[in-house]
A protein has these predicted regions:
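ATP-binding N-lobe of GHMP and related small-molecule kinases
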Residues: 1-114, 118, 122-136, 163-168
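Fold-level recognition of mixed alpha/beta catalytic cores in primary-metabolism enzymes, strongest
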Residues: 108-192
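C-terminal nucleotide
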Residues: 1-16, 39-76, 86-87, 170-258
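Flexible, active-site-adjacent loop/turn segments at secondary-structure boundaries
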Residues: 22, 27-28, 32, 102, ...
Length: 258
């Protein structure tokens, strides 16, 4: 456990280069961290409370380091992270006053919320330790469990793994979550913000549901169909089995993967 009273961490936003909307289907993606960050600064407050301040959102909250969070409010990733980390042997034993701020645009598709979760996980693990070796992969795994699995959210693994590992990666988003770092620089790439808010969870939930439904419909007719091994020929072979409202999602699931 760290003995210094002040700690600072940061986590980047991310962009998807190839395979957008494929990670929740367990298909591979290529994504890249960007030079916009969420920063966490924390000072020991000699209490048994976490005091969180988020000036960019003009909000704050406090809770006991002993809080169990047996029930979760939707989207409360601070609480779900505490709950998940206890399963990994991470038990906070002193309070901190924590400030989270950053320059990643919110609701802009750059994973600001995942960056907050990754930074929060990293702070807690490094500060209080756990029963496993702390690696970038472990931080990504815990962040994914805290943000997605614990809330039954529709997202995949791309955001948490890209942000926690950093740089550019090729990621298998299936159960293995294996990755390869790509040692290349994307010089001159500019990310523009439209200013139009993105309803991430609502959009992902709808797209994931329809994509999975189209795949499951095909598998009812052919149990050997595997989206990870699908080719363009499979579109012609199976699309007639689908109702009109699912055909586009089946086409996209295969075409985007190739």
């Amino acid at each position: 456990m760290r003995t210094t009273s002040e700690v600072m961490f940061k986590a980047p936003g991310r962009i998807c280069l190839f395979g957008d909307h494929q990670d929740y289907l367990g298909l591979p993606i290529i994504a890249c961290a960007i030079d916009l960050f969420i920063e966490v600064s924390a000072i020991s407050n000699e209490s048994e409370m976490f005091h969180l301040v988020m000036p960019d959102l003009k909000t704050s909250r406090s809770f006991s380091i002993h809080e169990s969070f047996n029930s979760l409010e939707k989207g409360d990733h601070f609480a779900s992270t505490i709950r998940v980390l206890k399963r990994y042997g991470c038990f906070p034993n002193k309070g901190y006053s924590v400030t989270l701020r950053g320059n990643i645009p919110i609701n802009a598709g750059l994973s600001s919320s995942s960056a907050i979760v990754v930074a929060w996980v990293r702070f807690l693990l490094i500060t209080f330790g756990c029963s496993k070796e702390i690696t970038h992969e472990l931080i990504a795994k815990i962040a994914h469990e805290s943000e997605v699995l614990e809330h039954n959210s529709p997202g995949g693994k791309m955001d948490q793994y890209t942000i926690a590992i950093g740089g550019m990666i090729f990621l298998q988003t299936n159960e293995t979550a294996s990755f390869t770092k790509i040692d290349s620089l994307l010089e001159g790439l500019v990310v523009g913000e439209s200013g139009i808010p993105k309803n991430t969870l609502g959009l992902l939930g709808d797209l994931k549901e329809k994509a999975l439904c189209s795949i499951e419909t095909v598998q009812k007719h052919d149990a050997t169909f595997n989206i990870a091994a699908a080719t363009l020929l499979d579109i012609e072979k199976y699309i007639h089995l689908l109702p009109k409202e699912l055909k586009l999602f089946f086409y996209a699931a295969i075409k985007n993967h190739l």
